């Protein structure tokens, strides 16, 4: 993208993490804060997993709240991922859940209570750690709980339940956002889109 910008492509970007913001600026890409934009034409992002319906698990980079804010505000979302991220059912990759630090263990217990109600059992979960022994804090100051729930038979239902739990800031289920996935493979790229 930076090469295309140097060659004359006119774009304005709004990154979803401080690290991406810094990188984009260093490469000469014009960056603005999201609130400065009237609309966002296109979100291009990665995914930790995607299923045949283009439902996604995102948040491996701990920017899921900001990523979902931008995806929701965008006219279109295109995902770029390698073939290993394509799954029949979501859940192989642990589901990131962004949680407010206040009452975080209470929130964690509520999540597990609801998992049992959804038939997902007592899935193991762990707090995402930063380098060393400290808990990772997102750019927004929240914690990330990685939930290893295994296959998720109904991502819509799980997302709806997580949305009701006080303390859950956001979750990494991106349902209905992606319009197309560009899958990188050894022989080139393959396009996966809603039929």
Language-model features: where?
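Catalytic nucleophile loop
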Residues: 13-19
């Amino acid at each position: 993208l930076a090469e295309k910008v140097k060659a004359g492509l006119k774009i304005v970007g709004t990154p979803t993490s401080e690290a991406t913001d810094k990188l984009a600026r260093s490469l000469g890409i014009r960056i603005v804060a999201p609130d400065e934009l009237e609309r966002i034409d296109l979100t291009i992002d990665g995914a930790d997993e995607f299923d045949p319906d283009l439902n996604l698990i995102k948040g491996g980079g701990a920017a899921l709240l900001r990523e979902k804010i931008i995806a929701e505000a965008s006219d279109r979302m295109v995902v770029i991922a390698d073939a290993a991220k394509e799954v029949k059912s979501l859940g192989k990759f642990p589901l990131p859940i962004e949680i407010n630090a206040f009452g975080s263990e209470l929130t964690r217990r509520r999540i597990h209570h609801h998992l049992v109600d959804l038939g997902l059992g007592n899935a193991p979960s762990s707090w995402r750690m930063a380098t060393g022994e400290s808990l990772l804090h997102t750019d927004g100051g929240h914690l990330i709980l990685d939930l290893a729930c295994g296959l998720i038979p109904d991502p819509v239902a799980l997302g709806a339940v997580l949305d009701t739990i006080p303390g859950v800031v956001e979750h990494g289920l991106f349902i209905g956002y992606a319009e197309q996935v560009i899958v990188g493979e050894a022989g080139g790229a393959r396009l996966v889109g809603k039929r």
